[in-house]
Amino acid sequence: MSKAAQVVAQQRRALLLGAAASLLPWQIAQAGKQAEEPLANAVQSVLSAAVLDSAPPKPSFDTMDERLVYLRWLGAMSGRLKKKHTEHLTRVDFLEAVWYESKRKGLEPSLVLGLIQVESGFRKYAISSAGARGYMQVMPFWARLIGDGDASRLFHMQTNLRFGCVILRHYLDIERGDLFMTLGRYNGSRGRAEYPNLVFGARKAWDYKAA
């Protein structure tokens, strides 16, 4: 097979994987192995401050219209998540935290939910073969680099979501807004199409357009 044919075959396979992600709501964890990269002292300080902020995941709104948009989103997402988390309060707590942590770092909740679907299948205590933990499959070395060193806390819902969103935002900044490369870096497969396409496909199940 020629190189051109191999590239076409790889692209076709990646597109099929992305389509499958949008059709299969709960997948096996796809966590790779995030690389432990050196951090400049200033960057490390900023990331540490971001994850150690103890503010509760309760969103605030400037207008009633903004609050209504959020409440409609919460209701819609709760319905979509019901098959995985049957207990209403558990779903609401989780979705409130996803909204808060993603918006706090300038990320779309649909992207974060799609990533969680692919990474852990919404399993709080998921552990990958590489040792990544929790909903967003955060590698334990992050607890040492920017946390308090206690990797067991990565199984705590808000802690895991906070670390995951802070790390994803950090990678997005490094990649200058290139989401494809950002997702590859998050998964430890930078430059490869399979993982980003899975997340892009899964994200479609969590898209929400305000009325």
Task: Show which residues each predicted segment covers.
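N-terminal secretory signal peptides
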Residues: M1-Q10, L17-P25
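Small/flexible residues
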Residues: A14-L15, N187
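Short, surface-exposed loop and linker segments with low hydrophobicity and enrichment for Pro/Ser/Thr
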Residues: A4-V8, R12-R13, W99, L107-P109
